[in-house]
């Protein structure tokens, strides 16, 4: 093999290596960006074993036995008691259920229930936000970790779901999590005004997630 051919092969190898590195970097960067901006799609139907039983307990204890009218969300700490909140279409109430111990580690738990009436228009805005968040979810988003809090959003009666895990501050998911936490706090004290005060944030974040939805179909 002459010197010129060796140089050409070396150049090709260098270019291919560089391209491979750039591809890996691009995927890593993309995953990082998505982890900050989107939820992660969650397919409960694929759960098996202990995880499946855990989801069944969540539905049974916190989400009206899985019989949901419209939208819902859960807050699932790694070690503390979980929360589930869903919309009761018949009474136009947000229903929050909280357990005193972590369901994963406890055979028996106590459930506390709280209710807060909201207007139909407010319910529609919350549903619109949740729908945009779930439909813009991406498998590139980081799904979860070992220690923290998992937040799950459910729409269409729980048919579609997506989640995030302890998102970083000032990200889209963190803004969504803040709304979930504020909704939970408002329902606990039956404060309809506090729910209504979240409307500007809800509308703003809905627009952001809808723009991410549009990106998926460009």
Which residues fall in each region the model found?
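Function-determining sites in protein domains
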Residues: 36-218
């Amino acid at each position: 093999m002459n010197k010129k051919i060796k140089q050409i092969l070396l150049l090709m190898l260098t270019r291919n290596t560089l391209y491979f590195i750039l591809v890996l970097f691009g995927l890593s960067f993309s995953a990082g960006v998505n982890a900050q901006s989107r939820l992660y799609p969650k397919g409960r139907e694929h759960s098996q074993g202990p995880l499946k039983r855990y989801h069944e307990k969540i539905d049974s204890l916190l989400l009206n036995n899985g019989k949901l009218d419209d939208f819902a969300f859960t807050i699932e700490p790694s070690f503390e008691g979980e929360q589930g909140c869903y919309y009761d279409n018949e009474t136009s109430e947000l229903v929050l259920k909280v357990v005193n111990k972590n369901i994963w580690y406890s055979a028996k738990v106590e459930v506390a229930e709280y209710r807060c009436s909201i207007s139909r228009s407010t319910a529609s805005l919350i549903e619109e936000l949740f729908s945009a968040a779930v439909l813009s979810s991406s498998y590139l988003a980081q799904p979860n970790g070992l220690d923290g809090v998992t937040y799950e959003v459910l729409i269409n009666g729980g048919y579609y779901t997506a989640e995030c895990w302890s998102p970083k501050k000032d990200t889209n998911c963190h803004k969504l999590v803040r709304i979930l936490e504020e909704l939970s706090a408002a329902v606990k004290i039956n404060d309809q005004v506090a729910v209504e005060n979240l409307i500007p944030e809800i509308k703003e974040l809905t627009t952001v997630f809808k723009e991410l939805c549009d990106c998926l179909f460009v």
